[in-house]
Amino acid sequence: LFDPDSNVPRGEFLAMCMHLTGTETLQGVLSTGFGDDMQIPAWSKAYVATALMNGDVCGCSDGTAIVFDAQRGITAAEAAVMLSSFLEPSPAAALESDYIPEWACAAVSSLTSCGVYPDGSDCAAPITRAEAAQMLLGAYELLQKR
């Protein structure tokens, strides 16, 4: 069931990005290296560990450890940064907005300029499956042009 209005967990969006770009995952991964490893679903550990090793994700602090937070809904800004790390789009002029976090500005600007990131998205809001599908379709179309 697609359920277009439900939020996309961070781990699922990462797996979608890696499938889209043909990124091979490590085999036999039992641990990701993140402080919340026990909460990361077994099916996604290879994706998370591979992306961490390749520098495509870095996690964030929960006050006690660096965590990936695989089950939490990914925000639009986080999705832009994650997808951008796999696509490596051409740099674009920074968008002027008080709503784009500084750490996501380059990714949001680049993906917006190439039509992957929907202009005017709420960067702080979790993305839905429909929004993720729209972003990934834009990314697929961008990859086909290369």
Go through each PLM region and give its residues.
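Feature responds to low-complexity, polar/acidic, surface-exposed segments characteristic
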Residues: 1-14, 18-46, 57-77, 83-126, ...
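BRCT (BRCA1 C-terminal) phosphopeptide-binding modules in DNA damage response/checkpoint, repair
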Residues: 50, 54-56
